[in-house]
Swiss-Prot record:
Keywords: Ribonucleoprotein, Ribosomal protein. PROSITE patterns: RIBOSOMAL_S10 (PS00361). GO terms for cellular component: ribonucleoprotein complex; ribosome. Part of the 30S ribosomal subunit. SUPFAM superfamilies: Ribosomal protein S10 (SSF54999). The lineage of its organism: Bacteria, Bacillati, Mycoplasmatota, Mollicutes, Acholeplasmatales. This is Small ribosomal subunit protein uS10.
Length: 105
């Protein structure tokens, strides 16, 4: 591998609760930084907002509606030139089940 080539692992975290996702990102950064690699992030990505509209009444009153909203927060963490110890520490990390993790190379 040349000095100019960088191997990057991208970790994308998704969750409905932004406090939970920030805690998970901090935990990942703490664990990975102990292995001595360069880290970029957490970088906040755009929040996806979904709005659901439902009728309040089961039969009449079409004008009476209720709206529900679901926001999906995302964070990006980039690990530059990871070593074997870094990847092994990522495999054994435990995060809450409410967080979706996507790893890309």
């Amino acid at each position: 591998m040349n000095k100019k080539e960088k191997e990057i692992i991208k970790i994308i975290l998704r969750a409905y609760d932004h406090h939970l996702i920030d805690q998970a990102a901090k935990k990942i950064i703490d664990i990975v930084s102990k292995t001595g690699v360069n880290i970029e992030g957490p970088i906040p990505l755009p929040t996806r907002k979904e709005v659901f509209t439902v009728l309040r009444s089961p039969f009449v009153n079409k004008d009476s509606r209720e709206q529900f909203e679901r926001r999906t927060h995302k964070r990006l963490i980039q690990i530059i030139n990871p070593n074997k110890k870094t990847i092994e520490s990522l495999m054994h990390i435990s995060l809450p089940t409410a967080i979706d993790i996507l790893l890309k190379k």
